[in-house]
Swiss-Prot record:
Gene: proS
GO terms for cellular component: aminoacyl-tRNA synthetase multienzyme complex; cytoplasm
This protein's name: Proline--tRNA ligase
SUPFAM superfamilies from the UniProt entry: C-terminal domain of ProRS, Class II aaRS ABD-related, Class II aaRS and biotin synthetases
Function of the molecule: Catalyzes the attachment of proline to tRNA(Pro) in a two-step reaction: proline is first activated by ATP to form Pro-AMP and then transferred to the acceptor end of tRNA(Pro). Can inadvertently accommodate and process cysteine.
Amino acid sequence: MTKDGGKKDNQGQDKKAQQYGVTPQSVDFNDWYNEVVKKADLADNSPVAGAMVVRPYGSALWENIQRWLDDRFKASGHESLIFPTLIPMNFIMKEADHVEGFAPELFTVNKIGTEELAEPYVMRPTSETIIGHMWSGWLNSYRDLPFLHYQWGSVFRAELRTKAFLRTSEFFWHEGHTAHADEAEARAEVRQQLDLYHEFCRDVLALPVVRGEKTASERFAGAVATYSIEGMMRDGKALQSGTSHYLGQNFSRAFDVKYQTREQKEEFAHTTSWAISSRIIGAIIMTHGDDSGLMMPPRIAPIQVVVIPVGRKDNFDQMVQEGEKLAAELRAQGLRVKVDGRDGVTNGFKYNDWELKGVPVRIELGPRDLESGVLVVKNRHSEDKETLPRAEAVSGMSARLDTIHDFLMKRATDFLLANTAEVDSYDAFQREIEAGHWVRAYHCGEPACEKSIKEDTKATARNVPFDDAEFFAERGEGQCVKCGQPSAYGKRVLFGRQY
């Protein structure tokens, strides 16, 4: 922390930010986030309370996310299907923990026109119930297993305090659902998908995340075990960025999902579910953004390179044409490139606009550059410009983007580690949480004790890191930081305030 209470490595550039109309993070992080989402053309408010309109730039980002994940789901043998948005209310009621967990968030359909429905529907909060119902008719023999299914779509959960991408009453996701003959295979599936999410965050989004198991209090409603990846945002709050759940036979028993074994016995299937949602866009914004706006990870950015032709009125059209030729050279490498040929807009406005949108690399191309065979290149994360021979700049662009990815990953990792504290006393726990840090502490595992911590500090148990997690995997024994009872997990639990 800095002397004035700000976060370590804060990206404060107040004067510059005010000039461009974005509230600095250090002044009001919430305002900064909302302004960046809107001014960078990611999303806008809609006339439907709690729902957002995702604009083309935000939609292109989500499509890139979908494409990367979808390719890997299919490569591992998973099949896409489509289920209805409406689910019979009685399905939700069949699994006791499930209905208790989701009841306050349900959107209910009671009428068609003016006619009351005998059996109301709910708008899909998640699909375990309707998928279980259908599986019960599809599954007969052990030969049918495993079922490896997923779908992309919207889900609906009522939110009183909404925030674009992070908490909206309608949001977008994929949800995976699988059924297996035994527990070991199902648990392996759950871990495989969480590891895929971790790979995606690390290698594509440049997001360091902590993999681990949720405590009983934080488990998905109806699950035997829930696993998560947790990321630290630049205000120190945690964002649950992906989850996977081992559901045991709970939903199979509720929906009669059973099969005949090799020994001609009937057994209930072991099922899983797993998801990443549009919340991950919020993680990108809040992990990498600075006081000038977004900072897109290059491997997922809708536009990786923007070319800005610089010229006078009498030669501007020619420079735009030259910009398109340059863009074609870059696209031949498989890069996503935009030429900003807007007329009547100053170069300064264009520079600021693309800084706000977080495009990783900007190239300026003027008549003198063309004559000299050079390009002026600027990385989004740096204030410096480079003048490079054209061939060198073009041939080195993919490597440049990889270097930017590595920079973002290292900066975010350093920030996470610098703002996580290890404590053994409750006084220290409270101080660190109040300072906006994550805390690692021993805990007894009792839900009532966790609830007491949350009431005192607004912090929740994020997860218990895996033994092979990149961060905080060390094992150890100690006393609960709150009540003094022995630790339940053989290692420290990760706590923090969350989105």
